[in-house]
């Protein structure tokens, strides 16, 4: 099995926000035992969804849960800067295109209980790949192996991929950057994701300037507590 290592700078970064993600992890646990497969998305790129996905997966693994992090943002993956491989790796797109077995793409990491599926090479037809039978087949094969599966998806405000992925998930979380995305765009993204049939679990308000007292513009979405204030 291929091994990935989280670079030291990313581990240090995650340590700084450990308390916040532990709170989010606890809220997910309280949301219901059935919420095990979670899609993480945002309205636009650069809002911090990939860092959120990674930090949440780390928190779950460090709490003793066998966790799989899937990089499904195959159009614009940024996780190659977070995880370094010790050899040649295959990823999600290799599996979805029929060019790899499931066991070939699940990688161990230097964090106990955390495994990762890298995105793989950028495909010419990412949406079509996600719609083929392989994606649901993969979820069916792994859902009883892991305690939690965290899937980093493309931004729902740009492409429909996140909704396709969410259809196979128990719930989804929206990550949005404070002061960047207008409320109506966040609401539209939530509605688009809900059309997948997946359960809306909340919004994580990211990159918050803590000197500002309130963030009422985003309304009451049942988000994961007022302490979920993080950086990308």
From Swiss-Prot:
Reported regulation of activity: Dephosphorylated and activated by CpsB.
Listed GO biological process terms: capsule polysaccharide biosynthetic process
Post-translational modification: Autophosphorylated.
Pathway per the UniProt entry: Capsule biogenesis; capsule polysaccharide biosynthesis
Keyword ATP-binding applies: yes
GO molecular function annotations of the record: ATP binding; non-membrane spanning protein tyrosine kinase activity
Top-level taxon: Bacteria
Enzymatic reactions: L-tyrosyl-[protein] + ATP = O-phospho-L-tyrosyl-[protein] + ADP + H(+)
EC number: 2.7.10.2
One Pfam assignment: AAA_31
Enzyme class, broadest EC rank: transferase
Function: Involved in the regulation of capsular polysaccharide biosynthesis. Autophosphorylation of CpsD attenuates its activity and reduces the level of encapsulation. May be part of a complex that directs the coordinated polymerization and export to the cell surface of the capsular polysaccharide.
Name of the protein in its database record: Tyrosine-protein kinase CpsD
Protein's gene: cpsD
């Amino acid at each position: 099995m291929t091994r990935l290592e989280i670079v030291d700078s990313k581990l240090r970064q995650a340590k700084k926000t450990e308390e916040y993600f532990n709170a989010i992890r606890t809220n997910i646990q309280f949301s219901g035992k059935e919420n095990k497969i979670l899609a993480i998305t945002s309205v636009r790129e650069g809002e911090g969804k990939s860092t959120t996905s990674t930090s949440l997966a780390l928190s779950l693994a460090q709490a003793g849960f066998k966790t799989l992090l899937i990089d499904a943002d195959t159009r614009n993956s940024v996780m190659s800067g977070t995880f370094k491989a010790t050899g040649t790796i295959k990823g999600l797109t290799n599996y979805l295109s029929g060019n790899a077995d499931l066991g070939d793409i699940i990688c161990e990491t230097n964090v106990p209980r955390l495994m990762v599926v890298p995105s793989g090479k950028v495909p010419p037809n990412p949406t079509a790949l996600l719609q083929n039978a392989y994606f649901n087949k993969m979820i069916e094969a792994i859902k009883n192996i892991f305690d939690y599966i965290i899937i980093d998806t493309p931004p729902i405000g740009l492409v429909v991929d996140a909704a396709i992925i969410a259809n196979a998930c128990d719930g989804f979380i929206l990550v949005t950057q404070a002061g960047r995305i207008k409320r109506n765009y966040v609401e539209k993204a939530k509605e688009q994701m809900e059309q997948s049939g997946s359960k809306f679990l909340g919004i994580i308000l990211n990159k918050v300037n803590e000197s500002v007292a309130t963030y009422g513009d985003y309304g009451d979405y049942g988000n994961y507590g007022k302490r979920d204030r993080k950086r990308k």
